[in-house]
Amino acid sequence: MANHDLPRVASRFNTDGQGATRARAVGVMLYALRGTPFIYQGEELGLPDAKIPPEQAVDVDGRDPQRAPIPWQPPSVAGPGAGFTTGTPWLPLDE
C-alpha cells in the first residue's frame, strides 16, 4: 500500500481530514492479507508526510516528505533533533 516513493497513507488519503481513520483502515486491510506485511517507516505510527520547505528539499523528485526521520520525542521536549539525533538531520523533522 505504501513505500518510500509514495506519500504516507495518512497523507495520501487525507482529503477531508480523515487521514488517521483511513490509515487505520488500510492497516487493518494490510494485516488481513495473506503473506508477510511490509510497512515503511512511519506507517506503523500513522505519521503524515513531513512538511519540508522547498529550500530544504534534497530529492529532486520530491520524495523527501515520506523519507524524513521519525521523531522519537516531541521537538518541544527533545529539542530540534526530536530525540532522533543530537546533530543536524539530513532532512528536517516534522513538528
Question: Where are the model-predicted features located?
Answer:
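Active-site clefts of carbohydrate-active enzymes
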Residues: 1-17
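Loop/helix patches that line or flank the sugar-binding groove of alpha-linked glycan CAZymes
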Residues: 17-95
